[in-house]
Structures are given as C-alpha cells and as structure tokens.
A protein has these predicted regions:
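Amphipathic alpha-helical segments within well-ordered protein domains
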Residues: 43-46, 84
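Histidine- and aromatic-rich ligand-binding microenvironments
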Residues: 6-7, 37-38, 94-95, 116, ...
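Acidic, PIN/NYN-like endoribonuclease modules and their adjacent C-terminal/linker elements
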Residues: 1, 102-132
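Alpha-helix capping/helix-boundary segments
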Residues: 10-11, 41-42, 79, 101, ...
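Active-site neighborhoods of divalent-metal-dependent phosphate/nucleic-acid chemistry enzymes
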Residues: 71-113
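Conserved beta-strand segments of alpha/beta enzyme cores
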Residues: 34, 71, 126-128
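Anion (oxyanion) recognition and catalysis
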Residues: 29, 66, 106
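Short, well-structured N-terminal submotif of metal-dependent ribonuclease cores
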Residues: 1-37, 50-63
Length: 132
C-alpha cells in the first residue's frame, strides 16, 4: 500500500481544494493509501489558519484533521532523534518542522508531499513537490 507523509503546506493546499493534491487525499479516503502527519506539523497548520482565519476556524479545521483518515504521529524518542539528526545535517536550510516531516517519511518509508522548495531538494526520501 502506498504511504505518504503530508507537510503543512500540502495540508493547506488540501484545505483550499487544490486539485494537485486532491488525488492523494482521495487515495487515503478510499483506503488505497495511508497518510501521516507529525504533531509538530499539525500545530503549524493550526497556527497558520488561526493567523489568517481566526481561532474558531482553526479549531474546526484542527478537529477535522484529527477525525480524518490521516494518522497524526506524536514525536516519540526515535522520531525526535531522527528529526534532530536531519536538522543538524540541513541546518540553515530546513525548519525543524520540515525535519520532522522528513524524518517521519524516512521512518515510514513513505513519499513526502511538500510545498517547500528546500525540502524538495533533499534526497533522503522520495518527494513529491507542489510549488506555490
């Protein structure tokens, strides 16, 4: 079964109905693929929606993700260490949240779906880049 890790930007594209990411989310909802997101990226998603649309909308969208087919992954010891290693390797290029997504994709042997151009240049995992 296909596995994806979704970064914050891709989740935001999904929120606005971007057709480029729709097929990936359809695969998950139909049970043909699995998708994961880190708690850290979910926090980033919440605050970006809160900044633009307010806390009430952020709460609704946050709970929709929690109740969707996306697996929300907590930062356990293995993921935290791997994200730290990635941040050390890509210091100055990738945010800590991006390093968590990258580490999760590596641990899950998943394709990382991202809108981040710097993250798209990394070759640690398979990446599908959606320019914005």
């Amino acid at each position: 079964m296909k596995r994806y890790v979704v970064d914050t930007g891709v989740l935001l594209l999904h929120l606005i109905g971007d057709e480029r990411v729709k097929t990936y989310f359809d695969e998950v909802s139909q049970g043909n693929a699995r998708a994961s997101i880190c708690e850290i990226n979910l926090a980033e998603y919440y605050y970006k929606i809160c900044e633009k649309l307010g806390k009430e909308i952020a709460e609704i969208r946050y709970h929709q993700i929690r109740e969707s087919g996306l697996e929300v992954v907590a930062a356990d010891e293995e993921l935290t260490k791997k994200a730290g290693e990635k941040k050390c390797r890509y210091r100055g290029r990738l945010s800590l949240a991006d390093c968590f997504s990258l580490a999760l994709a590596e641990l899950k042997n998943a394709i990382l779906l991202t809108t981040d151009s710097e993250l798209a240049r990394v070759r640690d995992v398979k990446i599908r880049y959606f320019p914005v």
